[in-house]
């Protein structure tokens, strides 16, 4: 779990996302509160529940990007899902409890990676012995092994091919579901799980010494880990630090004056209620309590309104954050300021062909102006419009770059207008092309 202060979290998000200070503040406080809660004594810790967040804002302003960057920062099990993927319990499709099962799987991978680092040194030695067995045989003399060990560590044998025995990963046993079993979609029931490893099925692989390194270290690390303890730790991490980002929540709103049942809408909202409020979900690894999992929901709400959500669901998302539509200045900053801005990406891509791309300041102004103009006349899709405009402007350069190695291509305002100006002015054409 990260122990960044809210100010540090915001400054980290600022490296990649332009504007939206309110949303950044809200998620940074929520993330810090996770850490604060863990510092409390056990009795009070149980009572402090997370304040779930609802982010409201037009498409393309940074809601999903905030979630993506937060996931990398959090150092906690994090899952981003679209609310539209789920159906009401009892219908064909995924029910919302699958969110928690997926979150547990994410946590298990995270905990395993962390624990592998703790046993890396021992695993490295065991893996080295297995490589030497493959190279010179298990019964070779100590002198021979030492000679090959020195060559191995010096990297002289990296390209040599060897045969290694590795654990067969799944695929050998069919999966089946037990009808009527609650949560039968727990990833189904594997016959391999029921009968154990059946003597540990292995397969022989032919790989180079260099590529065998990671395979064998991972396998030897797993032998040194206690899987049951690892799973219990992962469940504990999910229950205390888990974060779920529910995107497109506005798409499961039931709008006023709509009649008739809708499998993927109100029923999904009703199923989400206990999950967000706090319930116990059965997974194949054990029961998981959701009381302290943080839920961040987001939606554009350009057709539905937040008030169209079930009142109970609104009450379970107490913190509301409104993200602002992007202005021309925001568009300009998005093109230049983030660490991996669009301009930097295109310059780097062209450099691989030996072409130097020189995009002037007035070209950046023109690109921002066109993106804002098209957004206002056609459909406001926010910063995503910049990608469409950039692709259109640089289409000719991208196509011919491989024939222009060593050249410098200058893109100024006149170049931008020449390649896209007329399209942007013609609303009917830009509706289909930009």
Swiss-Prot record:
GO terms for biological process: protein unfolding; proteolysis involved in protein catabolic process. One of its GO terms (molecular function) is proteasome-activating activity. CDD domains: RecA-like_HslU. Keywords: ATP-binding, Chaperone, Cytoplasm, Nucleotide-binding. Pfam families: AAA (PF00004), AAA_2 (PF07724), ClpB_D2-small (PF10431). It is found in: Cytoplasm. Its main location: cytoplasm. ATP binds at residues 18, 60-65, 247, 312, 384. SMART domains: AAA, ClpB_D2-small. GO terms for cellular component: HslUV protease complex. It comes from the Bacteria. Belongs to the ClpX chaperone family. HslU subfamily. ATPase subunit of a proteasome-like degradation complex; this subunit has chaperone activity. The binding of ATP and its subsequent hydrolysis by HslU are essential for unfolding of protein substrates subsequently hydrolyzed by HslV. HslU recognizes the N-terminal part of its protein substrates and unfolds these before they are guided to HslV for hydrolysis. A double ring-shaped homohexamer of HslV is capped on each side by a ring-shaped HslU homohexamer. The assembly of the HslU/HslV complex is dependent on binding of ATP. This is ATP-dependent protease ATPase subunit HslU. It comes from Bradyrhizobium sp. (strain BTAi1 / ATCC BAA-1182).
């Amino acid at each position: 779990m990260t122990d960044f202060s809210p100010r540090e979290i915001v400054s980290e998000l600022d490296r990649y996302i332009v504007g939206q200070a309110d949303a950044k503040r809200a998620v940074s406080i929520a993330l810090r509160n996770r850490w604060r809660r863990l510092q409390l004594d056990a009795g009070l810790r149980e009572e402090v529940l997370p304040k779930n967040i609802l982010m409201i804002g037009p498409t393309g302003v940074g809601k999903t990007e905030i979630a993506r960057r937060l996931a990398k920062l959090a150092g906690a099990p994090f899952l981003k899902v679209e609310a539209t993927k789920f159906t009401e319990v009892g219908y064909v499709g995924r029910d919302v409890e699958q969110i928690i099962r997926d979150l547990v799987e994410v946590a298990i991978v995270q905990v395993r990676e962390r624990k592998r680092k703790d046993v890396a040194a021992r695993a490295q030695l065991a893996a080295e012995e297995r490589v030497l067995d493959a190279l010179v045989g298990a019964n070779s003399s100590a002198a021979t092994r030492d000679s090959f060990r020195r060559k191995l560590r010096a990297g002289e044998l990296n390209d040599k091919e060897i045969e290694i025995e590795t654990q067969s990963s799944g695929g050998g046993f069919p999966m089946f579901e037990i009808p009527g079993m609650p949560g039968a979609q727990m990833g189904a029931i594997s016959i391999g799980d029921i009968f154990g490893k059946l003597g540990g099925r292995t397969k022989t692989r032919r790989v180079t010494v260099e590529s065998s390194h990671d395979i064998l270290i991972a396998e030897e690390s797993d032998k040194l880990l206690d899987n049951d303890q690892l799973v219990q730790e992962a469940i504990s991490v999910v229950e205390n630090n888990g974060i779920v980002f529910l995107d497109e929540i506005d798409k499961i709103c039931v709008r006023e004056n709509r009649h008739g049942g809708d499998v993927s809408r109100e029923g999904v909202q009703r199923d989400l209620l206990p999950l967000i409020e706090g319930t116990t979900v059965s997974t194949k690894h054990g029961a998981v309590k959701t009381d302290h999992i943080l839920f961040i929901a987001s939606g554009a709400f350009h057709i539905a309104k937040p008030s169209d959500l079930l009142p109970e669901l609104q009450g379970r998302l107490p913190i509301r954050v409104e993200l602002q539509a992007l202005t021309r200045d925001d568009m300009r900053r998005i093109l230049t300021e983030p660490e991996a801005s669009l301009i930097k990406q295109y310059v780097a891509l062209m450099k691989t062909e030996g072409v130097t791309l020189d995009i002037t300041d007035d070209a950046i102004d023109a690109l921002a102006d066109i993106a804002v103009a098209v957004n206002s006349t056609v459909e406001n899709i926010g910063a995503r419009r910049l990608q469409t405009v950039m692709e259109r402007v640089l289409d000719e350069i991208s196509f011919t770059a491989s024939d222009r190695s060593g050249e410098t291509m200058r893109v100024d305002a006149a170049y931008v207008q020449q390649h896209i100006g007329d399209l942007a002015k013609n609303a009917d054409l830009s509706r289909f092309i930009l």
